[in-house]
């Protein structure tokens, strides 16, 4: 089992100074506190990064980016043009050497036009983004990441922290090394993984789902689309599926020292197979493909879910 974490570079290079005279006062300034509002083109990018602290972004119906930011010790670098707004922590001294240890906590409160693309990064800090209704890339090395109302492509990643994503109208990648992952109300493909933590996927309408964890449980409560592909892998945890009645899928189940249980009779039909630690069987018309693999955990399949929006808050 391989869990791939894309760790983006968390130190953002300063953008080139702007030449627009009306925005000149907002460009390339180093400050300890920023309270400003700038215009952003429709579909523009908001790029925020810090070393330690908190980032909070909310979407609104104005064509402006409003920023309220401060830092306890150090300086903030702010750049803006009509298509991109950037805010980062200046972590180099006059000689160009990095000085992470001398930089204090920063706090960003930012409102963005709906439809903006967000790039949010923290070394040690929590990230929250809601209501932007655009693409989102959110990454924290040590901190929790929570995103809602993203569209098209959404990525939420952490190394040490929990990841939560909800109300995503598009594809989602949610990953962490040490922490739990929860995805809720997603309408695109889902890729969710954790090394040391549980993975929960609830109320999704997805044609392709891939989940992986090493030492945690996997819970999936959602639809199985005809012709869809679904994969669930855990080394030492339980895999639990809550799927609607009438689901049609071919199941491939593999477990070394765990057991398999379902709320329906498992019948090995023609073309299916069963051997020690592995079985294949069909439910309904068998159009979807479902793969479940665990080394020392249980596999539980429940078709008692009466809707695709059923929640599992156990």
Which residues fall in each region the model found?
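Intrinsically disordered, low-complexity terminal regions
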Residues: 1-314
